[in-house]
Amino acid sequence: MSKTRHLFGTDGIRGLANQDPMTVEIAQKLGQAAGLRFTRGVHRHRVLLGKDTRLSGYMIECALVSGFLSAGMDVTLVGPMPTPAIAMLTRSLRADLGVMISASHNPFGDNGIKLFGPDGFKLSDETEAEIEELMRSDLAGRLAAPDRIGRASRLNDAAGRYIENAKASFPRGRRLDGLRIVIDCANGAAYRVAPTALWELGAEVIRIGCEPDGININEQCGSTKPESLCEAVVAHGAHIGIALDGDADRVLIADEKGRLIDGDQILALIARSWGRQGRLNSAQIVATVMSNMGLARCLEGLGLELVRTAVGDRYVVERMRELGANLGGEQSGHMVLSDFATTGDGLVAALQVLAVLVEEGRPASEVCRMFTPFPQMLRNVRFTGKSPLHAPSVQDARRRAEAELGTAGRLLLRESGTEPLVRVMAEAEDPALVERIVAEMCEAIDSAQVVA
């Protein structure tokens, strides 16, 4: 019988800091349980631990460290560092486990914990369930003897290691001389490494969202609030703008006119570039159910096939591994380039876009506009208690909407994996139809809550 997860969601454990499940007590117990799960044999075991710039990161970090040490694991601390850097360093240092303390694009009051195996990939649902089962048990008799308690140390060159790894994804012999780039690091984990990597490659770098104070992460900046980036690109006469999120596993682009370029366009651009160079391992490009139908048509024109998964970069990665594909991503900006990373890496993806810009010598507004997207609308409906998604009235409304859209459009209803929200998305060539269907579905979901 398979074990079930209660704490872990689609991207680790996440919640409001100092409230269940993001408490000191749970973080410490998680450290103990994960430490025991990944301690095999009598040799010293090590966990690599990083975080973003949230104030609560100090608290969660200390709790996790105490848990891991009590389980007999040595802890290597790297401080604020992008999520993909933690995955990369876990592999590079031959650590038994990697941990990232971050709530990604969420507000500063939230925090989260993501776990990576020794191969740098996020843990499977089954392994997370095993850790939860250990957390629910009495671990007192299984913790380390006094002479086997772990030690904590700090890795001082973590930033430099990640910067060099990211730069290695940029074509050898090419530079960014003459390019003026605005980089928005969301006051998050990449505030030092991303601007430095671009500068070392020769770009003129204009920084915004690079002054974290513990509470301003993702605040009116970064990939979830790209308006400041778009304005800065125009104001500074920049060639391109790059927006990362709080843990730098997402990226969005602004062209020289200050217009936003989403993950679907970025994915199509990299697919075309890599396809021309013979660098694609597969004719299948992996994206999620949120990706625009225009992306599918664009890839078809390139002789490629779009394969869809559930939302979440972990599911994109899993499908890529099954297919042997080396390129996948999400409309939200998660770009997985498995030649260079085991998870979404915003900086590495941005460097692929910049490589095309340098190669073609054309403006970003021309290079990055790969297709005209279908009109698409996404709305979130917050709920309390039980999800209204499976209510008969909602299902009836869904069937009517899908019949009306036919094969010329799509309707997607899904529950968020991190918040009590139902996401309603529709797309079709007729924008008025899209707007009406989304409005009707949102009304049906709201009405179902009232009835319940």
Curated annotation (Swiss-Prot):
Mg(2+) binds at S104, D245, D247, D249. GO terms for molecular function: magnesium ion binding; phosphoglucosamine mutase activity; phosphomannomutase activity. One of its GO terms (biological process) is carbohydrate metabolic process. Activated by phosphorylation. Its EC number is 5.4.2.10. It is an enzyme of class 5 (isomerase). Its cofactor is Mg(2+). Keywords: Isomerase, Magnesium, Metal-binding, Phosphoprotein. Binds 1 Mg(2+) ion per subunit. The active site is at S104 (phosphoserine intermediate). One of its GO terms (cellular component) is cytosol. It comes from the Bacteria. Pfam families: PGM_PMM_I, PGM_PMM_II, PGM_PMM_III, PGM_PMM_IV. Belongs to the phosphohexose mutase family. HAMAP family: GlmM_B. This is Phosphoglucosamine mutase. It comes from Gluconacetobacter diazotrophicus (strain ATCC 49037 / DSM 5601 / CCUG 37298 / CIP 103539 / LMG 7603 / PAl5). The gene is glmM.
